Amino acid sequence: LTGIFISLEGPDGSGKSTAAKKIVPQLQQLSTQEVVLTREPGGSAIAEQLRDIILDVHNSAMDARTEALLYAAQRRQHIVDVILPALQANKIVLSDRYIDSSVAYQGAGRQLGMQEIWQLNLFATQKLLPQLTLYFDIPPAVGLKRIQQKRAQAADRLEKEQLDFHQRVTAAYQQLIKQDADRIVKIDAQQTPDQVVADCLAIISQRFNLGD
């Protein structure tokens, strides 16, 4: 694979989705490679249908293992439809969430076991990992407060979970960072949005020698 694969991770309300939209045009100026922004859950037609099922607030009866399997399923389809073709075409793929989200949210948040969810997703992804993951670091209470202020009515099924769920998610992310410090780089997500974007671009440029 000749392209570059970057994922953005973080708790709910960390601002990564907003930052991603700003990073893309600036990253495009630094690189001759086409930049593709995608997201999980979703990113392609079938995966977006699975997203709707996963995040629907009416599906409160969904079993935790079902949820984990659906996330793995949408990820597989997203890889086949979007990520692999883009990487094979020498593009830069920026994915808003990827495998670490499942390990943190289903492994720790839902208490299914981080190792079990990691194994499930290695099967789904055929071990395709990003070369770089930017982790938007923010205390869970701050992230949830942002969601309540901005879009409380539109919060999805996982965003509506209690604080202890989100604390387990954040603790799991910190554990993943320790285990894979080469791949996962922390960004201070409590800075101004512009500073967050600037930090992301600096790390990406340095890691992949862009804009020299």
Question: Where is each model-derived feature located?
Answer:
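Pre-Walker A (Motif I) flank of P-loop NTPase domains
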Residues: 2-5
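Hydrophobic anchor at the beta1->P-loop junction of P-loop NTPases
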Residues: 8
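P-loop (Walker A) phosphate-binding loop of NTP-binding proteins
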Residues: 11
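Conserved lysine of the Walker
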Residues: 16
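Hydrophobic positions on the alpha1 helix immediately C-terminal to the Walker A/P-loop
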Residues: 19
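NTP-dependent small-molecule kinase module
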Residues: 22-24, 141-212
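ATP-dependent small-molecule kinase phosphotransfer cores
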Residues: 30-125, 199
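A glycine- and Lys/Arg-enriched "phosphate-lid" helix/loop adjacent to the NTP-binding pocket
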Residues: 101-171
